[in-house]
């Protein structure tokens, strides 16, 4: 019996065995990502793909300053409104800035035909050469070129007119038919602007041009149009009952344009040889211009970012991220960040990849924790970690490269009569924007799911690598841990980690320890059976004694009559 009790004591006294665990890195990161199946998954590492900040400044673009139109708009600048004289010397820019209160446009009232299309053309121009297409001094010898001035375009209190146009009127009582041609030899497109004057009365027509039935004809290989003045009474605008309509065309290299008129011509004086590029644009912004430089400009401010997406503004100029409506686009690069609960013991829940990661392992994503007589410690598996880092880095770079189509996105121009087209265009643009946003978000969700699954797969592979080496020299105890059936010193532990574990060397010791443990289990079962029998007999005796005592007490006080028959 003493031997049995000794075996039972041994069964409840377990010596601490050598142990090795497979696990993964955890840290104090609070980064969260979304996946297809989950939201706000905390991860150890992640990269942001969405730029949401700007510097609040209008800057030079790649070292080239923008053209700030100030109180002028594009029309006032190109026509040469006297209030825009400071812009006459501008010949190159990175982009063009209008403000919300750019009031100086056409000074003489009238309509600028196809003005929105002209703005679109100028959006792709980064510089031009302003030159006299028809010199004022000798191009119109039979007509007056100095009397065409008006109070509508006054400057510093004196009558004036556009700096790039000539208002040609009769000389004396004669306005002979004029004809003037220009052949483009600039080697690039030339922007030519002219106008047609529409007087309010026939007397004004005669006093200015003499000819009652005047016309203006403009023709090139691509443009051909004849204009006749529309004489009619109109309400005064800026003190003028007359109107001027403004026209423009682009003349190709080698092409010739001819102006013919018997009156009412607002002739071109200066024209513009255009240098086109893809990086310019026109933006409307009240943001101040600063002495700074950027690669991407929005009306709100400059973006200095290499990220593939931004949600600052849909209008951009330069090498800019794609605008999306998203508020968060974060891609996971690390693992699920689930630090283990330290109070649960070294080889409880904290030890494995099932319930939590290790904050103590800081030099890799996956690795080992061991404990033996020589101590305990963490060690990262550098090979699997490096392979994972390379794979995920390549994936992130590939995603950024594919989605990082940087370009200029400027607003399209529509006049007041094209509201339906403008509204339709906005709907189309919104549709494309929704598609871009959906694609970006879906891409990130899918890649995050794949990345986290990839990490889980790598940890599982590391676990299977250890398991296949140890075989029956150790047993699985959960949470990614193995308990050795033999003593495993630091050299032994290192061999498990680097894949050189010598199974035959430890198999005999492991076999003996397994058999001893199994024997203890069998002896323990015998003890448990003996104790169960003793416990049953003792319980029965106690029950019988209790019943006898109760019966004796009841007989003694008359509650129970006892008759003994012989």
UniProtKB/Swiss-Prot annotation:
It comes from the Viruses. A lipid is attached at residues 555, 562, 565 (S-palmitoyl cysteine). InterPro entries: Capsid_hemagglutn, Hemagglutn_HA1_a/b_dom_sf, Hemagglutn_influenz_A, Hemagglutn_influenz_A/B. Glycans are attached at residues 27-28, 40, 104, 304, 498. The record marks 344-345 as: Cleavage. Residues 18-529 are extracellular. It is a single-pass type I membrane protein. One of its GO terms (molecular function) is host cell surface receptor binding. Its main location: virion. Palmitoylated. The chain crosses the membrane at residues 530-550. Pfam families: Hemagglutinin (PF00509). It is found in: Virion membrane; Host apical cell membrane. Disulfide bonds join 21-481, 59-292, 72-84, 107-153, 296-320, 488-492. GO terms for cellular component: host cell plasma membrane; membrane; viral envelope; virion membrane. Residues 551-566 are cytoplasmic. One of its GO terms (biological process) is viral budding from plasma membrane. Keywords: Clathrin- and caveolin-independent endocytosis of virus by host, Clathrin-mediated endocytosis of virus by host, Disulfide bond, Fusion of virus membrane with host endosomal membrane, Fusion of virus membrane with host membrane, Glycoprotein, Hemagglutinin, Host cell membrane, Host membrane, Host-virus interaction, Lipoprotein, Membrane, Palmitate, Signal, Transmembrane, Transmembrane helix, Viral attachment to host cell, Viral envelope protein, Viral penetration into host cytoplasm, Virion, Virus endocytosis by host, Virus entry into host cell. HAMAP family: INFV_HEMA. Belongs to the influenza viruses hemagglutinin family. Major glycoprotein, comprises over 80% of the envelope proteins present in virus particle. Binds to sialic acid-containing receptors on the cell surface, bringing about the attachment of the virus particle to the cell. This attachment induces virion internalization either through clathrin-dependent endocytosis or through clathrin- and caveolin-independent pathway. Plays a major role in the determination of host range restriction and virulence. Class I viral fusion protein. Responsible for penetration of the virus into the cell cytoplasm by mediating the fusion of the membrane of the endocytosed virus particle with the endosomal membrane. Homotrimer of disulfide-linked HA1-HA2. Interacts with human CACNA1C. This is Hemagglutinin. It comes from Influenza A virus (strain A/Swine/Netherlands/12/1985 H1N1).
């Amino acid at each position: 019996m003493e031997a049995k009790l000794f075996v039972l004591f041994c069964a409840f006294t377990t010596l601490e065995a050598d142990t090795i665990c497979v696990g993964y890195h955890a840290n104090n990161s609070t980064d969260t990502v979304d996946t297809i199946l989950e939201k706000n998954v905390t991860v150890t590492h992640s990269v942001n793909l969405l730029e949401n900040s700007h510097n609040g400044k209008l800057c030079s673009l790649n070292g080239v300053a923008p053209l700030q139109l100030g109180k002028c708009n594009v029309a006032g600048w190109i026509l040469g409104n006297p209030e825009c004289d400071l812009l006459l010397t501008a010949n190159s820019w990175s982009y063009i800035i209008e403000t919300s209160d750019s009031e100086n446009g056409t000074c003489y009232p009238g309509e600028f035909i196809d003005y929105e299309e002209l703005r679109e053309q100028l959006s792709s121009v980064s510089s031009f050469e302003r030159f006299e297409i028809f010199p004022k001094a000798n191009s119109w010898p039979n007509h007056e070129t100095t009397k065409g001035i008006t109070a509508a375009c006054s400057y510093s209190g004196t009558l004036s007119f556009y700096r790039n146009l000539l208002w040609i009127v009769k000389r004396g009582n004669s306005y002979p038919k004029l004809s003037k041609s220009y052949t483009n030899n600039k080697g690039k497109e030339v922007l030519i602007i002219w106008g047609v004057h529409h007087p309010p009365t026939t007397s004004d027509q005669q006093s200015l041009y003499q000819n009652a039935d005047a016309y203006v004809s403009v023709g090139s290989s691509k443009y051909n149009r004849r204009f006749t003045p529309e004489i009619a009474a109109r309400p005064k605008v800026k003190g003028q009952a007359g109107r001027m309509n403004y026209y423009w065309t682009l003349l190709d290299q080698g092409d010739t344009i001819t102006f013919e008129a018997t009156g009412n011509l607002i002739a071109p004086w200066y024209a513009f040889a255009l240098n086109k590029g893809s990086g310019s644009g026109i933006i409307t912004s009240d943001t101040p211009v600063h002495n700074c430089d950027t690669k991407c400009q929005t009306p709100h401010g400059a973006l200095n970012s290499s990220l593939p997406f931004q949600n600052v503004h849909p209008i951009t100029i330069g090498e800019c991220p794609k605008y999306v409506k998203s508020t968060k686009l974060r891609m996971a690069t690390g693992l699920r960040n689930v630090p283990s609960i330290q109070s649960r013991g070294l080889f409880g829940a904290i030890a494995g990849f099932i319930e939590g990661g290790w904050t103590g392992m800081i030099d890799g994503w996956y690795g080992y924790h061991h404990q033996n007589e020589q101590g305990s410690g963490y060690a990262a598996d550098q090979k699997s970690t490096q392979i994972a880092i390379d794979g995920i880095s390549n994936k992130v770079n590939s995603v950024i490269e594919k989605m990082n189509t940087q370009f200029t996105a400027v607003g399209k121009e529509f006049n007041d009569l094209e509201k339906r087209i403008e509204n339709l265009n906005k709907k189309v643009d919104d549709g494309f924007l929704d598609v871009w946003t959906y694609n970006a978000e879906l891409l990130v969700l899918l890649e995050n799911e794949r990345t986290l699954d990839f990490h889980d797969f790598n940890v599982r592979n590391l676990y299977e690598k250890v398991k296949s080496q140890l075989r029956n020299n150790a047993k699985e105890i959960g949470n990614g841990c193995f308990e050795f059936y033999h003593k495993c010193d630091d050299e032994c532990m290192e061999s498990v980690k680097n894949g050189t574990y010598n199974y035959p060397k430890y198999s005999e010791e492991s076999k003996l320890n397994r058999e001893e443990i199994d024997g203890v289990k069998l002896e323990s079962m015998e003890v448990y059976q003996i104790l169960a029998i003793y416990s049953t007999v003792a319980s029965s005796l106690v029950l019988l004694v209790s019943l006898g005592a109760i019966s004796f007490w009841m007989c003694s006080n008359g509650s129970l009559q006892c008759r003994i028959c012989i």
